[in-house]
């Protein structure tokens, strides 16, 4: 299923740093430190992207992560303020369960999952993160789950039915 690329310049994106990691390379003269930053960008209206930036300084790593995230933007189908159906995302040993929730529930999620969902514009959702607690795996499992979401219209088209037949309305 071919999708048109999303132009990051047309959207009002806000970025959010999920995790910063300091790594050390041991050299003859001691340790040389560098940083990696996991960054999430989103417009709060169904577009979100994640990126990993690496540099010798934290601000530069964050900037690179933001640029990478803007290149990885994708669309999240929303039904009002929640997701259309329950979905399970996998990455490595990380698993993230996303369930739609009623109005007023809020985003019941922690850490990396919350950052992605809020950036995407999801306001009411229940989540459960299982397996790996590594922010990289949790973040990528959340993204994998969001990419598996299908709108009611897409599901109807794939099954050769009308949207009203699927929703039971």
UniProtKB/Swiss-Prot annotation:
GO cellular component terms listed in the entry, alphabetical order: small ribosomal subunit
Keywords assigned: Ribonucleoprotein, Ribosomal protein, RNA-binding, rRNA-binding
Pfam families assigned to the protein according to its UniProt record, in alphabetical order: Ribosomal_S5, Ribosomal_S5_C
Main function: With S4 and S12 plays an important role in translational accuracy.
Organism expressing this protein natively: Anaeromyxobacter dehalogenans (strain 2CP-C)
Classification via PANTHER family: MITOCHONDRIAL RIBOSOMAL PROTEIN S5
UniProt keyword Ribosomal protein, yes or no: yes
GO molecular function terms attached to this record: rRNA binding; structural constituent of ribosome
Protein known as: Small ribosomal subunit protein uS5
Domain S5 DRBM: 13-76
The protein's assembly and partners: Part of the 30S ribosomal subunit. Contacts proteins S4 and S8.
Gene3D superfamilies in the cross-refs: 3.30.160.20, 3.30.230.10
Family note: Belongs to the universal ribosomal protein uS5 family.
Domain notes: The N-terminal domain interacts with the head of the 30S subunit; the C-terminal domain interacts with the body and contacts protein S4. The interaction surface between S4 and S5 is involved in control of translational fidelity.
GO annotation (BP), single: translation
Gene that specifies this protein: rpsE
């Amino acid at each position: 299923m071919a999708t048109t690329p999303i132009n990051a310049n047309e959207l009002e994106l806000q970025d959010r740093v999920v995790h910063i990691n300091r790594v050390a390379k041991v050299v003859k003269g001691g340790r040389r430190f560098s940083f990696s930053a996991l960054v999430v960008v989103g417009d709060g209206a169904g577009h979100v992207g994640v990126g990993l930036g690496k540099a010798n300084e934290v601000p530069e790593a964050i900037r690179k992560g933001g640029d990478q995230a803007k290149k990885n933007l994708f669309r999240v189908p929303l039904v009002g303020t929640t997701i259309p159906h329950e979905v399970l995302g996998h990455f490595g040993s990380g698993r993230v369960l996303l369930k739609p929730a009623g109005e007023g529930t809020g985003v019941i999620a922690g850490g990396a999952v919350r950052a992605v969902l809020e950036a995407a514009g999801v306001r009411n959702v229940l989540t459960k993160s299982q397996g790996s607690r590594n922010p990289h795996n949790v973040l990528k499992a959340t993204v994998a789950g969001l990419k598996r979401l299908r709108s009611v219209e897409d599901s109807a088209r794939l099954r050769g039915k009308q949207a009203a037949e699927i929703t039971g309305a």
